[in-house]
Swiss-Prot record:
GO terms for biological process: mRNA splicing, via spliceosome. This is CWF19-like protein 1. GO terms for molecular function: RNA lariat debranching enzyme activator activity. Gene3D superfamilies: HIT-like. It comes from Xenopus laevis.
Length: 540
């Protein structure tokens, strides 16, 4: 079958920042090659005199979009003037208004359904709104075809209501109240492989969801909902999304209906049948939005720290932060009397790094939350952010030492999260060697280590309370095993200590590697001093 992979860019509200958008597109295309089209959801035009002046440059031909660009219609009365034809028209060279509602099918066979505007309950609706009649008309025009299986892409400016049901947490609590029930119904029926929306100023990439009932209906393709932030936003939230797609009509059915590991139930199924909403959403603090491709603009910000005179670090001029507390004794809660503070290397706002007791290597360290969290999937977004900062700092540090690190977590028979970070000499083995060794040794013990999909995250795969073992390689590749019954407690260390990697099998059990208190203090000081130039908590 003559499959042709299309390369598509999508962006959120432009608000008249045309130069910012198109300059960004030029940079992307210079770095990653040409894309076939740019799809813009949300408000393309701004309302300020300055944005009108910028638009006149494109309208006159003085400036030109570097890619074929398709936009949706107005979302307010002020910008209605730009859209002369409700059925769509060319606005400027390389910039096309799709229309109020309809289906756009290119020569490639890619099917793009679209609905402009915001929801209105009144008739007649303003020119920048859609009504239930518009949604019904669009649905019927497509679904009346007996061969209809869904569309490749759905573009709406507004969010669908209840999109986070069964899914990952929304970026903020306010987002729960937004959205159109009509768009939820439209998405439920059109079954888009990708659904893009904007207007809320947020980047939210929902887990893929099913379009069929398991064991009751034939398998169908999954849908992905993605909201993008506004172009050039000051918070550096992601506003461009890049993806490859082969039109549904040219895709083998077996490939089309493959279900990813992190797929969820359909968020609209209950609302479509007018039944009560699901209450299965996690709180907004439970998850941080997943970043994909090369458009993550977030940069960690360091803070100046001062020493407490005991080797630890304290935050300057900050109110004490409230962290979750254990119900009983815990060896790893920083405020606990049981914690061995002489092993602490660095302390942030939410996490700390400590030398591993009985480490595989002298620079084997742990990343731990200050508060009492059992696993990665329990972490709040603030803690996740700082964990990522520590991971990045350690990665850079070990690279200067000619090493790569392997990180693993065992959420089984443990009450406090410990991210084990073990550096390995580059000359010792390749990343692929490490990956293969983990998989093979898991198989030898009757376990299956699954590779987590490239753009997925462990919080999308395991619910809080789920026992699991997780590995992250320096390449970003991730392996996951859901623990059902028994699990060897030293498995991560056993793999790394094995002949295939470090060849130090006698150090597989930490209890066989314990040092004296004085030796531990020396090792900790040595590591702390070496790591200091890379410790973001010490930076201005």
């Amino acid at each position: 079958m003559g499959e042709r992979v299309l390369r598509v860019l999508t962006c959120g509200d432009v608000y008249g920042r045309f130069d910012v958008l198109f300059n960004r597109v030029r940079v992307i295309q210079k770095k990653s090659g040409q894309f076939d089209m740019l799809l813009c959801v949300g408000s393309f035009f701004g309302t300020s005199p300055e944005s009108q002046t910028h638009w006149d440059e494109y309208k006159s031909g003085a400036k030109k979009a570097p890619i074929q660009t398709y936009v949706l219609g107005a979302n307010n009365q002020e910008t209605v003037k730009h859209f002369k034809d409700v059925d769509g028209c060319e606005l400027a060279a390389n910039i096309t208004y799709l229309g109020r509602k309809g289906l756009f099918t290119g020569a490639s066979g890619l099917q793009i359904a679209y609905l402009s505007g915001i929801e209105s309950s009144s008739e007649p609706a303003p020119a920048y709104c859609f009504t239930a009649k518009d949604v019904t008309s669009l649905k019927m025009s497509l679904m009346s075809n007996s061969k209809f299986k869904g569309v490749d892409i759905l573009l709406t400016s507004s969010w669908p209501k209840d999109v986070s049901n069964y899914g990952n947490a929304l970026p903020n609590e306010a987002s729960k109240k937004c959205g159109s029930a009509l768009i939820s119904n439209l998405a439920f029926n059109l079954k888009p492989r990708y659904h893009f929306a904007a207007l809320e100023g947020e980047n939210y990439e929902r887990l893929p969801y099913r379009n069929h009932l398991v064991l009751q209906e034939n398998a169908q393709h999954v849908s992905r909902f993605i909201s993008l932030a506004s172009v050039g936003n000051l918070d550096k939230k992601k506003y461009i999304y890049a993806f490859n797609i082969v039109p549904m009509s040219l895709t083998d059915i077996a490939d089309l209906v493959k279900q990813p590991l992190d797929v969820t139930e359909n968020p609209y199924r209950k609302s479509d049948k007018d039944t009560p909403k699901s209450k299965g959403n996690k709180s907004a603090e439970e998850e941080e939005p997943t970043q994909q491709f090369f458009f993550d603009l977030n940069k960690p910000q360091g803070k100046k720290r001062q020493t407490d005179g005991k080797g630890g670090r304290q935050s300057q001029a900050k109110q004490p932060r409230k962290h979750p507390q254990p119900t009983g004794p815990c060896w790893f809660c920083l405020a606990s009397p049981e914690v061995e503070k002489h092993l602490v290397v660095s302390i942030g706002d939410n996490c700390y790094v400590a030398l591993a007791k009985g480490g595989l290597m002298s620079d084997h360290v742990l990343i731990l939350p200050i508060g009492h969290y059992q696993s990665t999937v329990d972490l709040s977004s603030d803690v996740v952010k700082e964990v990522e900062q520590y991971k990045a700092a350690l990665r850079t540090f070990f690279k200067t030492k000619g090493k790569r690190y392997v990180m693993f977590e065992r959420n089984y028979k443990s009450q406090h999260l410990q991210l084990q970070v073990v550096p390995l000499p580059l000359s010792c083995c390749t990343t692929e060697d490490i990956k293969e060794t983990f998989i093979l040794q898991a198989q030898e013990q009757g376990m299956e280590l699954l590779e987590i999909p490239e753009h997925s995250d462990i919080k999308q795969i395991a619910q809080p309370g789920t026992p699991y073992f997780y590995v992250e390689l320096d390449s970003g590749e991730k392996l996951f095993h859901r623990i059902k019954k028994h699990f060897p407690l030293q498995f991560g260390r056993e793999v790394l200590a094995s002949e295939a990697i470090l060849n130090i099998p006698t150090r597989a059990d930490w209890k066989d590697c314990k040092s004296s208190r004085a030796e531990e203090e020396d090792l900790t000081k040595t590591f702390r001093d070496a790591f200091e130039p890379f410790d973001f908590t010490l930076q201005d």
